[in-house]
Amino acid sequence: MRVSQKGIDLIKKFEGIRLKSYICPAGVLTIGYGHTGSDVYQNQQITEEEAERLLRRDTESAQQAISSFVSVKLNQNEYDALVSFVFNIGPTAFVNSTLLKLLNHGADRKIVAGEFGRWVKAG
């Protein structure tokens, strides 16, 4: 399964776009649609096309984590929501999350969805 355009649009909506690098509320240098990493530097500027490429690349690690660690079948909406979630918190936090444990142990999806609320924006 792959993230859909609807899933990409969800991330874009939550993240917003910034074409000049900035310090996010968590204190991390960020650009585009929430892209972070050693390739982001002070006063960096990118185009919307570059921001889109970075977002697509960044969602790959989220999708790899889901593929590697989720052991239950997901529908497209669930998958897209998980990609957005893992994109935001990172694969390591996802692998250690209660959300993943509940999901893999077959918990009711409403209970699993309730776990999203435990993760709030930094700052």
Regions found by a protein language model. Name each.
Residues 68-79:
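Short, structured surface segments that line ligand/substrate-binding pockets
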Residues 33-35, 85-87:
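Active-site-proximal beta-strand/loop segments in catalytic clefts of secreted hydrolases
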Residues 11, 78-86, 115-117:
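Short alpha-helical scaffolding segments that buttress acidic/His motifs in well-ordered protein cores
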